[in-house]
């Protein structure tokens, strides 16, 4: 009698292995990482390097000494978690806070559930939200673009979403004139976390993932379409208070979340209909949090809630 073998997700039904898909996502992230390095210089390099190394080391230690199993770092998932965590952080974040975030991301968000396939939340987002709650001051300092040799001493400025939130709150000195031009939002000439700076670079990554069939269009398109439509409705209701819908797509973690985080195999639906509903609710929640919540950005919370 044949045995029924039960194993945790992700269950890959194509010819691609988990490892090949992980490394394909790493390749897709390369343009955005390059833009962040060009935009923030030394700070971006330190954040990404520390995040990746800390995530890989944390997984290796837990696997070897706690689970007493062969190392799993070769599958690329720890590297990807480290890269995604780093892309969700400001370039001025002290290295020791990055290490704490990596330990939480891998130790709590992934390995506490048994490792890859068992986790119910995206590990990088678990680490990011933990740091946002534990170290709100450091996590909301946004260095200006172009300070290539600065790290923790970089001159900071408000992000586009921070300016929009300030306008909604009636903060003196905040105006729509301070918002970067659309071209700057596309190419990355503004402040923010490493993964916020260039929508165009992230869209290039999306094209690669779709071409390689690593992901399907359902989740990214449903997130972006819902955010655009709902953001547009709110802009029509009060254009002086709520930004235009294109602004919602090009700022914050909208592109990074829609393309690289909400599409996580383990924590997203498998059916096309489920993915469309899942994406639509993430897009709706993100705009609701941005416009009516206490945080300027809502993508991380929306994905974790869903």
Question: What are these model-predicted stretches?
Answer:
Residues 9, 57-69, 106-117, 204-213, ...:
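C-terminal ends of transmembrane helices
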Residues 117-203:
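Long hydrophobic alpha-helical segments that form multi-pass transmembrane helix bundles
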Residues 120, 124, 245-253, 275, ...:
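Loop-to-transmembrane alpha-helix initiation sites
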Residues 1-56:
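N-terminal signal-anchor module of multipass membrane proteins
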Residues 77-88, 125-138, 226-234, 253-260, ...:
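Small-residue-rich segments of transmembrane alpha-helices in multi-pass membrane proteins
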Residues 24-32, 47-59, 77-82, 86, ...:
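Alpha-helical transmembrane segments in multi-pass membrane proteins
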Residues 41-54, 92-101, 185-199, 242-254:
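Structural signature of hydrophobic alpha-helical transmembrane segments
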Residues 77-151:
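A generic, well-ordered mixed alpha/beta core segment in the N-terminal half of proteins
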């Amino acid at each position: 009698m044949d045995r029924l073998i039960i194993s945790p997700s992700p269950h890959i039904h194509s010819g691609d292995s988990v490892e090949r898909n992980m490394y394909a996502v790493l390749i897709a992230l390369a343009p955005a990482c390059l833009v962040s390095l060009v935009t923030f210089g030394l700070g971006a390099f330190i954040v990404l390097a520390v995040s990746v190394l800390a995530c890989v080391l944390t997984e290796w230690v837990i696997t070897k000494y706690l689970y007493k199993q062969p190392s799993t770092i070769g599958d690329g998932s720890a590297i990807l978690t480290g890269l995604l965590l780093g892309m969700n952080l400001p370039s001025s974040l002290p290295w020791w806070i990055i290490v704490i975030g990596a330990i939480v991301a891998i130790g709590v968000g992934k390995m506490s559930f048994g490792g890859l396939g068992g986790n119910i939340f995206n590990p990088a987002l678990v680490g990011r939200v933990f740091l946002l709650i534990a170290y709100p001051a450091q996590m909301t300092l946004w260095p200006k673009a172009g300070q290539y040799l600065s790290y923790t001493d970089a001159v900071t400025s408000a992000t586009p979403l921070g300016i929009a939130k300030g306008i909604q709150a009636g903060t003196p000195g905040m105006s729509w004139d301070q918002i970067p031009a659309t071209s700057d939002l596309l190419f990355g000439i503004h402040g923010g976390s490493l993964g916020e700076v260039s929508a165009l670079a992230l869209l290039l990554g999306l094209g690669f993932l779709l071409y390689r069939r690593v992901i399907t269009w359902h989740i990214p398109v449903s997130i972006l379409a819902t955010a655009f439509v709902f953001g547009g409705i709110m802009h029509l209701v009060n254009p002086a208070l709520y930004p235009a819908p294109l602004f919602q797509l090009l700022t914050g973690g909208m592109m990074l979340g829609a393309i690289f985080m909400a599409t996580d195999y383990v924590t997203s639906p498998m059916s096309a209909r489920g993915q469309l509903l899942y994406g639509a609710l993430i897009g709706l929640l993100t705009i609701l949090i941005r416009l009516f919540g206490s945080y300027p950005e809502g993508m991380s919370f929306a994905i974790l809630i869903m």
